[in-house]
Amino acid sequence: ISLISLLGITLGMTALITVMSVMNGFQKEVRARILGVASHVQITSMHGKLSNWQLTAEEASKHSAVEAAAPYVSAQGMLSHNQVVQGVLVRGILPDMEDQVANFANTMASGQLDHLVPGEFGIVIGMELARTLGAFTGDKITLISPQGQVTPAGVLPRLKQFTVVGIFEIGHFEYDSGLVLIHMADAQKLYRMDNDEVSGVRLKLHDLFAAPQVVNELPALLTLDSFISDWTKQHANYFRAIQIEKRMLSLILALIIAVAAFNIVSTLLLAVTDK
């Protein structure tokens, strides 16, 4: 009986270590995938558009924890191809600066990020979105902007044809199916923004876990009134769900070990009583 009890607690401990290792690895992998394309810290304007982004990026980069900064334009849109229409989040970027804050270069299934050239209206889309639209590198697709044009016939949405110059596969459905990248200059033209206006500035930190502290310290360095957020708030629900799952698994496995330990104690008590 004692051997069986010992075997039970051994299996329980093995299960605990294995499951916790898998969950920790899963959390680390998910975090790496999400934060590979999302920002550690994000600076946006209180008024919707951030003017003079160069100043904001320069001031933020003075913080010792900041590794790189890059501007972006973010807006809603719809893509149309092969009579299929799909809503997307359009992100206008500067490819050379984006490489410093994101990991898109290592996720490209075809094409390259630096194929986004201002004025040529190229677009990089996710693998799931490409499958939905039936689009391949080199295809022409139509981007529909919700900011319409006023005509005698009424308000009409703005349409612009883009060429697919790349397809990325991050491994996260939300991004692979709903995010597209275009050059920031093309995004500014499409959404009628001035050359020095952007949606915000994205920051990459040397230590991503220092993000909450950096958010508290950055306002002292910035001249313009800005709203600053970090990845722990932007993706809080997702990582909180993983943490709750880890705790519940730990509780269940701890109960298994407790039962096995109780069996050992009971066996020892019986042995002592018999003697």
Where are these regions (language model features)?
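Short aromatic/hydrophobic contact patches that present stacked aromatics
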Residues: 40-42, 122, 200-202
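A structural signal for hydrophobic secondary-structure junctions
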Residues: 54, 58-196
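Hydrophobic C-terminal alpha-helix "anchor/cap" residues
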Residues: 34, 59-64, 218, 222
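A common structural microfeature
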Residues: 8, 38-40, 66, 87
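Membrane-interface junction motifs in transport/secretion proteins
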Residues: 27-57
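Mechanotransmission and gating elements of multispan inner-membrane complexes involved in transport
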Residues: 147-148, 155-249
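Hydrophobic alpha-helical transmembrane segments of multi-pass inner-membrane transport and secretion
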Residues: 2-24, 243-275
